[in-house]
Swiss-Prot record:
Gene: deoC
Keyword Cytoplasm: yes
Disulfide bridge positions per record: none
Function description: Catalyzes a reversible aldol reaction between acetaldehyde and D-glyceraldehyde 3-phosphate to generate 2-deoxy-D-ribose 5-phosphate.
Enzyme Commission number, as recorded: 4.1.2.4
Pfam families hit by this protein: DeoC
Gene3D superfamilies listed in its UniProt record: Aldolase class I
Active-site residue list: D93 (proton donor/acceptor), K156 (schiff-base intermediate with acetaldehyde), K186 (proton donor/acceptor)
Protein name: Deoxyribose-phosphate aldolase
GO biological process assignments: 2-deoxyribose 1-phosphate catabolic process; carbohydrate catabolic process; deoxyribonucleotide catabolic process
């Protein structure tokens, strides 16, 4: 059987959120991130909300809310997201309360996401980080369904900060089988090679969150 052809470098770049969420990041680091993102031709840059506003002509600016633990009060997440959008963020990646999901408290997860959705209305894309590596398959499916009901635009695997790990092909495939075609699927956390990125895209990821974008893109054909 013939191997599936790899997507081109440009095709992959168009799906990348070039990300800098390190707590020690400086304004100069963000400026360097933006410059590299423009050189690479990626879709977006993703930075911490405290680094906004970011001047990034030609790029989408994304940020996070309730990051990385998800243990913030829903109203705090909503306020953080709303302020970020006021400061120019076009996309917000919020973290759910993973403990609530692990406990099967899906009504609490729903309320959390709805609060953020209502806070930003339709002014920005809302991605919901579920920390898939910390959840059972059943919980992944249920949280994806909850995110869809709450009005999210994407579900996202991971913050990249959770000790359970980051994106996996299994989780992405499960997420895509549950809400793919209706919601975007963002894989993030521990994606450092072109091979890993290609596997996640083949499994159904429609967006990639990467901090090592240049190294990953170097593995794709022009």
């Amino acid at each position: 059987m013939a191997e599936t052809a790899l997507p081109t470098r440009a095709e992959v770049a168009a799906r990348i959120d070039h990300t800098l969420l390190a707590p020690e990041a400086t304004d100069d680091d963000v400026a360097a991130l933006v410059a590299e993102a423009r050189d690479l031709g990626v879709y977006a840059v993703c930075v911490s909300p405290s680094m906004l506003p970011v001047r990034a002509p030609g790029l989408v600016v994304a940020t996070v809310a309730g990051f990385p633990s998800g243990k913030h009060h829903s109203l705090v997440k909503g306020a953080e997201a709303r302020l970020a959008v006021d400061q120019g963020a076009a996309e917000v990646d919020m973290v759910i309360d993973v403990g609530a999901a692990r406990a099967g408290e899906y009504s609490a997860v729903l309320a959390d996401i709805v609060t953020v959705r209502e806070a930003i209305s339709d002014r920005a894309v809302l991605k919901v980080i579920i920390e898939s590596a910390a959840l059972s398959d059943e919980a992944i499916v249920e949280v994806c369904r909850v995110a869809e009901r709450a009005g999210a635009d994407f579900v996202k695997t991971s913050t990249g900060f959770h000790p359970a790990g980051g994106a996996s092909v299994h989780a992405v495939r499960l997420m895509a089988e549950t809400v793919g075609g209706r919601l975007g699927i963002k894989a993030s956390g521990g994606i450092r090679t072109a091979a890993a990125a290609a596997e996640l895209l083949a499994a159904g990821a429609t967006r990639l969150g990467l901090s090592k974008s240049a190294a990953v893109l170097d593995g794709f054909p022009s």
